[in-house]
Amino acid sequence: LAMTRGADVALCLIESGCLSHRLSTPNKMMEAFAAGVPALCSPLSEARRYLGDQADRWVLDDPERDLVSALESITREDIEAFTTPTIPTWEEGAARLREAYERALTTRATHR
C-alpha cells in the first residue's frame, strides 16, 4: 500500500466483456481505497456501489474513449474532495456471506 499511497489517482480498468467481470470487485480498486487514493474505474456495478455519490466523477462510462480526458481534467480539489469508501473487513464480509447462505437455506427449507 505504500506505493499506492504515493499516487494521486489509481486506475482500475477492467474489460467488462462478460457478466463475471462486470460484477467483479477488483483488488486494485480496493487497494486504492485502502490507501485513501481515488481510483478511475471501468463501469463496474461494484465500483458504482462503493463510490456512491462520487461515482459520476470516478467511474468512466467508456474507459477507452474517456480515460485521457478524465486524467487531464482531474484537479487537486477533486483529489482532496475524494472520500474513501468504507471497505468491509474480511470478518464483516464473511459474516454477510454466512447470513446470505443462511437466508437462502431457510428459504429453500420453507419451500419444500
Language model segments and positions:
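Nucleotide-sugar-dependent
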Residues: 1-4, 12-30, 41-49
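CheY-like receiver
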Residues: 2-6, 70-73, 96, 100
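A short alpha->beta transition loop at the rim of the catalytic pocket in nucleotide-sugar-dependent
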Residues: 8, 36
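Short alpha-helix at the nucleotide-sugar/activated-sugar donor binding site of glycosyltransferases
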Residues: 33
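Short loop/helix-cap segments at secondary-structure boundaries that form the rim of catalytic
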Residues: 48-52, 81
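Conserved acidic donor-binding segment of nucleotide-sugar-dependent glycosyltransferases
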Residues: 53-65, 72-76
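A charged, aromatic-enriched C-terminal amphipathic alpha-helix characteristic of glycosyltransferases
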Residues: 62, 75-106
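Non-catalytic membrane-proximal stalk/linker segments that position and tether the catalytic domains
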Residues: 107-112
